[in-house]
Amino acid sequence: MNKESLKEYLSSRYQGWNSFLSNVIFPIFGENDFEDGFETELLESQPERRQLAEATGIRSIKQVGMMYVGVEPLQIFDVTVSDRVMMERNRVNIQRLIRAVMDQFSCAFMLFHYEDDTRWDWRFTYCRKSGNKEETTDSKRYTFLLGPGQSCRTATDNFMALYDKRDSLEIKDIEDAFNVEALSKEFFGKYKAQYEAFVNYMVDPANGMRQDFIDTDFDHTGMKADKIRDREEKPIRDYVKKLLGRIVFLHFLQKKGWLGVPAGKEWGEGDRDFMLNIFKNATERQKENFLDDILEDLFEEGLDRNRSDRGDLYDTKVEGFRNCRIPYLNGGLFERDNLDKKPSHFPASYFDGLLTMLSQYNFTIDENDPNDAEVGVDPEMLGRIFENLLEDNKDKGAFYTPKEIVQYMCRESLIAYLQTDQREEDKNCIRQFVTTHDAALLGDLKEDIDQKLCDVKICDPAIGSGAFPMGLLRELFFCRSAIEPNIVENAANIKRHIIQNNIYGVDIERGAVDIARLRFWLSLIVDEKSPEALPNLDFKIMQGNSLLEQYKGADLSTMTEKKVGAGQGVTIFDSMLDVYRKNLRDKLAEYYACPEHDKKAQLRKDIADIVKQELDEQGIRIDFEDMDLSANSQFFLWHTWFHDVFSRPSKEGFDIVIGNPPYGAKYDNQTKRYYKNTYVTANSIRGLQKGSLDTYTLFIELGYNLLRRNGSFAYIVPISLTSSDSLTGIHRIIMGNCDTIHISSYAVRPKPVFENAVVNTSILLFKKTETPCQHLFSTKMHRRGNEFELQRLIDNLNFVDVNGYTMIGRIPKIGSEMEKDILTKIFKNTLVSTKKS
């Protein structure tokens, strides 16, 4: 097997399963153990499978053979797909169908290809089914995209790695070859090197850009020289992050065939290597000033300008692309800011290296989940990269949450929400529906559950790069897709509805907000047949300091409320306030879908004027100078920007608050005083509690306050939640107001259960019932041993009710009823000894 010829083969159109066996499978695994499947058609004898297959767009599934890897059977299937769009949008049903056709406890190779157009890509998938039921969720699917227009470098390298081990192959070797994490680390390393190269070039005074981009307008008092320089150069780092983010976004977009579409051709017929080819085709002079001469104009005049009256045609000024179609995207990703307007110049080698590196990877727009992954760069990986590059993440105690944990927390919080006010006998059906997406399980509940899915209000108050809201977007989408008809036609509309009506997020770091918005935009693009103007997320995913709803000593949380009479304690909305609320609500809704620049600018001004007018009428006389009330790092107007959430009759607040808040941040004395005046748990109360100013404890109290009654809460936090006197305030809140609490705990030694975590962690789940705790479920401390698999750990968490066994600031971590019995005896003996004393 030759590497170059293999890559050429994988980059070609699909040539049939016989050809694939001869060119790939047999050279690696040999032919001696191969058992012919005689092209057995698996759909003919199973009508229920055929019905599911047709709904998924699958015409035929043939078992072409089986072989053994060690002692493990590995089946080989040829899958013919009748409609590409249906397969791309129906991953849930594909998973169900695969589980149905595979033998229990087995592995399989599957070749997916299209019967109606060989220009399209084809897919090689490795599946592993660990359970013994058709509906088990313990199955995984990993896919390489192959064929013309795909980067097959990773697939080639990994098949060659298997070939090198051909005499001693095991199933683990196959799973390692499909390891998305290995690809993620490789990509991040190369991406970070490119990022640092651009930053280092800009900060070098000899290259003439540093002085134009740095920020010197801040208080230097008490700062050392290296800290001053670092602070000055932050705008440069932010500029490079945004530049590279835009370029990576376009690599996702070009996979849709939406860039460089020839005049008169349809969307989807563009150049899938547009970014690299436009650089290659540029003149030497254009390459030497590629950013300002080519890319900046593409960003502003191409992607950020509506040219629908001209057939979306745009002149890139590069031969081969002088008169091509470029989509207008809206959304704000490519809007020019002050830094974009400054001259910037990089040697041609910088963009040559960056674009060549990016071209070696397959970019897959649909985000992977723990059980269904394309081996390539997906938006979730992009989120992880940007979160690792965010300013001071280590100092703020932030770490990226593994996707297995994201899915677990999203599903548990959604299940708790959907089970609210349901009969006990229906709750298990709801849980099974959320994990399997089988709507038949709901019976007569289907309409009620769908309405609750449409109405839910979700918030991550420390959104980072958007992992949890994106996770819940996926869960809501899959659940609604299982219930609602015509999912193929309605996929993009369902996602737009979810983003506009269900999801809210805030982060203090502007870069985090930018990447979170980018991921939501990509989630829409994956389901669009042709480009549509992206929504404006400025008032949905917002920058702000979640913990502060005050500025210069003034409380800004009551802007939408008016008190009647001193001491009456009754809140009403008078006619003027109703007008204010309606105007603000209408302007925000109009802004969300507005595609015109001038109109957007006017709407932003109108919105700011409405808020400032209300501040003035409330007697809040503060000079906000040039501060943007909707995007700053000083405070956040929860009850203003998200007033639609807090004004719902009998449901004032969010249904779900979820996240991975930072911990251990440092504050100045003024901020500490505000926190102590605002957060009950920040104060020590003699005989009751010891106060905590740790960031994560403040976020827990904030999250609790943001919830409506019976709202669901899910945070991942440091394990001191279960083992510190300073957490007694948090314990008083949740033990006094949450009927059922779940806490699972995870160690960092000998190796972190959650990669990149530097402290032991706990996942805290509860429902805000406003009644005392009846059940406090806890797990043992989970550690990472040999043959560790995070998904298996999460699927098999064992909770024990330890209510009544807590001590001041301490919650037991036990994993079995036997351990609980031992704890009971210890408590009894301690009580007897205390009485004797």
Task: List where the protein language model places each region.
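P-loop NTPase motor core
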Residues: I499-I503, G511, A533, L537-T560
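SAM-dependent methyltransferase catalytic-core segment centered on the flexible catalytic loop
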Residues: I458, A467-I494, E549-A593, D606-D609, ...
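Adenylate-forming
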Residues: L702, Y746-P750, K780-H782
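Short mixed-charge
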Residues: Q422-I449, S481-R496, I525-P535
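Conserved SAM-binding loop
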Residues: A516
